[in-house]
Amino acid sequence: ILHVAPEQAFFKFLKSVNNKNYITFDLNSPLADIKGDICAMPFEDNFFDFILCNHVLEHIVDDTKAMKELYRVLKRKGIAILQVPINVGRDKTFEDNNITTKKERIEKFGQYDHVREYGLDYYTKLESIGFSVEKNNYASKFIENDINKFGIVRDEIIPICKKN
């Protein structure tokens, strides 16, 4: 398992159940076993069975290169969860490299450290890299009370990416 930019809650759980085969990777995180750039990862081709990469790619200037790296290190028949915030009202991803100030980025991308706002074309982009993508509406599996209790985003689609 490769966990890019490990979140504390997932980190604790995955470390406790899969300590020997769980590798964390990030540019700066103190939780990272290996520090490095997602656009040039120090792993062999076809190394990981599973990759978890939540809310990372919207921060990466060359997201295509990062996606290609994730594809490269994923084993054939491996699975990658490559979640990003998606504006479902936008068909095409919006990015503009001239938007550089924190204020402008908050206005245009929703957060000061985002470099784009993904649209519905995100899934097609993943497919263009080579992944097959299953769009999983996981929230539909929960009852209304649990959606509110756990803070689940009702219409969020989780891309389950596979390398064939």
Task: Go through each PLM region and give its residues.
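Core SAM-dependent methyltransferase catalytic element
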Residues: 129-131, 135-164
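Conserved catalytic/acceptor-binding region of the Class I
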Residues: 100-116
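Charge-rich, low-complexity linker and terminal segments
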Residues: 104-107, 125-128, 147-148
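Conserved aromatic-histidine-acidic binding/catalytic patches
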Residues: 58, 110, 114, 149
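Short alpha-helix
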Residues: 112-136
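Catalytic cores of nucleotide-sugar-dependent glycosyltransferases that transfer UDP/GDP/TDP-activated
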Residues: 86, 112-115, 140-142
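Conserved SAM-binding loop
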Residues: 1-101, 120-127, 157-163
